[in-house]
Curated annotation (Swiss-Prot):
Protein name: Cysteine desulfurase IscS
Gene: iscS
PROSITE patterns assigned to the protein according to its UniProt record, in alphabetical order: AA_TRANSFER_CLASS_5
Subcellular location: Cytoplasm
Function according to Swiss-Prot or TrEMBL: Master enzyme that delivers sulfur to a number of partners involved in Fe-S cluster assembly, tRNA modification or cofactor biosynthesis. Catalyzes the removal of elemental sulfur atoms from cysteine to produce alanine. Functions as a sulfur delivery protein for Fe-S cluster synthesis onto IscU, an Fe-S scaffold assembly protein, as well as other S acceptor proteins.
Binding site for pyridoxal 5'-phosphate: 80-81, 160, 188, 208-210, 248
Pathway assigned to this chain's UniProt record: Cofactor biosynthesis; iron-sulfur cluster biosynthesis
Organism the protein comes from: Rickettsia massiliae (strain Mtu5)
Length: 410
């Protein structure tokens, strides 16, 4: 028995894009607001309310600092899905009497695409920009898609499935020159890569707590004040959050998001070094041991905590079953229950066979070198076994083009 394995806790968590474990420091900061500091932050007549309000405002400033925003520009929501809906539908509803066109990208998160499809039914025209084979948009195509009717461009910073980083600074520059609002779903990049809303000319940005070692059920929407961006609220009520998002604020969750943002701000460089080192170790060791493994998405223009790999000649589902000691996913967590190949990979022009073999491995703050080495050994031995059993792999080795095969119907 390898004594090293005694120290490993199985299964190993490698699904950091789906969610992250809460940082113990975040948990510690939240606990008092569940017990003794339980006041409603909107109660202005006593110290319980003032205490909660102070905690909320401190957290708001921590979130703002991480993206170079003003504290007043941060609106708390239940998460990035709500933030994306509020940004896209809120802009569309407020400005629809002036303009009727929105531009987004085929590889956006499902909630952005669904919000856009919903608006299409209401008569808003949507352009879905294609992506290049490396997963990144073409800036000229974006420029040409903008018309005098365009009110919003929505492009995420880090793709949740393949980890590529879109050129936000250039996109923001184009939008500002053309007088179009720029929204970005920054859930996968917030606290992981440097994002400055002013440098990138971002007008709206969606944030999620549980992607940065904070609690689930809390997020934020950055809404620019100068030049002012107006959104019609989705939720009406007491007029909290500058009238954009009514409802009593969940103080413990907000404190957790604030603390997670504060830690990310002070430890981003350390986290990045750690993740980049493990990415290189993981990828290089897999490539050394097995052939025909493809990294999906641009190798350099990416967040390296996301490693999406296609293993030719085997099915993604059979890989997941074979490596059940690793918590990984095929596609995004929201759609990984369906057996359809990933729409993101298909939109990059990756064939159905290869798209079906894709697995997303996530590396994060708490991933260890030992876990990565264990994962590499497990993956390589299981892929070898699965390929031995795979008639498709055998045919590929004989040089048969699988695309040209006509399968008989039984």
């Amino acid at each position: 028995m390898n004594p090293q394995l005694n120290k490993l806790t199985l299964p190993i968590y490698m699904d950091y894009q789906a969610t992250t474990p809460i940082d113990p420091r975040v948990m510690e900061a939240m606990l008092p607001y569940f017990t003794t500091k339980f006041g409603n932050p909107h109660s202005r007549s006593h110290s319980f309310g003032w205490e909660a309000e102070n905690a909320v405002e401190e957290a708001r400033s921590m979130v703002a600092k991480l993206i170079g925003a003003d504290t007043k520009e941060i609106i708390f929501t239940s998460g990035a899905t709500e933030s994306n809906n509020l940004a896209i539908k809120g802009i569309a509803k407020f400005y629809s009497n002036k303009k009727n066109h929105i531009i987004t990208v085929v590889s956006e998160h499902k909630c952005v695409l669904d919000a856009c499809r919903h608006l299409e039914q209401e008569g808003i025209k949507i352009t879905y920009l294609p992506i290049k084979p490396n997963g990144i948009i073409d800036l000229e195509t974006l420029k040409n898609a903008i018309t005098d009717q365009t009110m919003l461009v929505s492009v995420m910073v880090v793709n949740n499935e393949i980890g590529v980083v879109q050129p936000l600074k250039e996109i923001g520059k184009i939008c500002r020159e053309k007088g179009v609002f720029f929204h970005s779903d920054i859930a996968q990049g917030f606290g992981k890569i440097p994002i400055d809303v002013n440098e990138f000319n971002i007008d709206l940005a969606s944030i999620s707590g549980h992607k940065i070692y904070g609690p689930k059920g809390i997020g934020a929407l950055y809404v620019r004040k100068k030049p002012r961006v107006r959104v019609t609220p989705l939720i009406n009520g007491g007029g909290q959050e500058r009238g954009m998002r009514s409802g009593t604020l969940p103080t413990p969750l907000i404190v957790g998001l604030g603390m997670a943002a504060e830690i990310a701000y002070s430890e981003m460089e350390k986290d990045t070094k750690h993740v980049n080192y493990l990415f290189d170790r993981f990828l290089n060791n897999i490539h050394k041991r097995i052939s025909e493994v493809y990294l999906n998405g641009d190798k350099n223009q990416r967040y390296k905590g996301n490693v999406n790999l296609s293993f030719a000649g085997v099915e993604g589902e059979s890989i997941i079953l074979a490596i059940k000691d690793l918590a990984v996913s095929s596609g995004s967590a929201c759609t990984s229950a369906s057996l359809e190949p990933s729409y993101v990979l298909r939109s990059m022009g990756i064939g159905e066979e290869l798209a079906h073999t894709a697995i997303r491995f996530g590396i994060g703050r708490f991933t260890t070198e030992q876990e990565v080495d264990y994962a590499v050994n497990l993956i390589c031995s299981k892929i070898d076994k699965l390929r031995e059993l795979s008639p498709l792999w055998e045919m590929m080795q004989e040089g048969i083009d699988l695309k040209k095969i006509k399968w008989a119907v039984h």
